Amino acid sequence: MLEELKEEEIVNKIGGRFKLSTLIQKRLVQLNQGSRALVSVDTHDKMSIVLQEIVQDKIFLNMENEIETVDDLDAIVAASEAPELDPSDL
């Protein structure tokens, strides 16, 4: 799994080596503090879990360099969408 770190694709996906290392470090801290993995893998190696989460687009860094998950993003988008209007309410 660590071979993926050598690929430029994963570096470019995150936005550079610094952001990638920041994302990995922050996510490892979360996993060590008991956060659940966002992917199903046949390993308990936390580094492999984090890399698989990145490859599967499950986690990313927001503008404040904090970890966001796809679930967080979906909730933000849903909250920002205007509610559908019922024509009978008009």
UniProtKB/Swiss-Prot annotation:
Enzyme Commission number: 2.7.7.6
Pfam families referenced in this protein's UniProt entry, alphabetically: RNA_pol_Rpb6
Keywords: DNA-directed RNA polymerase, Nucleotidyltransferase, Transcription, Transferase
Single biological process term from Gene Ontology: DNA-templated transcription
A molecular function GO annotation: DNA binding
Top-level class of the enzyme under EC nomenclature: transferase
A single cellular component GO annotation: DNA-directed RNA polymerase complex
Keyword check for Repeat: no
Catalytic reactions on record: RNA(n) + a ribonucleoside 5'-triphosphate = RNA(n+1) + diphosphate
InterPro entries assigned: DNA-dir_RNA_pol_omega, Pol_omega/Rpo6/RPB6, RPB6/omega-like_sf
Top-level lineage group: Bacteria
Family: Belongs to the RNA polymerase subunit omega family.
Purpose of the protein: Promotes RNA polymerase assembly. Latches the N- and C-terminal regions of the beta' subunit thereby facilitating its interaction with the beta and alpha subunits.
Subunit note: The RNAP catalytic core consists of 2 alpha, 1 beta, 1 beta' and 1 omega subunit. When a sigma factor is associated with the core the holoenzyme is formed, which can initiate transcription.
Entry protein name: DNA-directed RNA polymerase subunit omega
Organism of this sequence: Rhodopirellula baltica (strain DSM 10527 / NCIMB 13988 / SH1)
Lineage summary: Bacteria, Pseudomonadati, Planctomycetota, Planctomycetia, Pirellulales
Gene: rpoZ
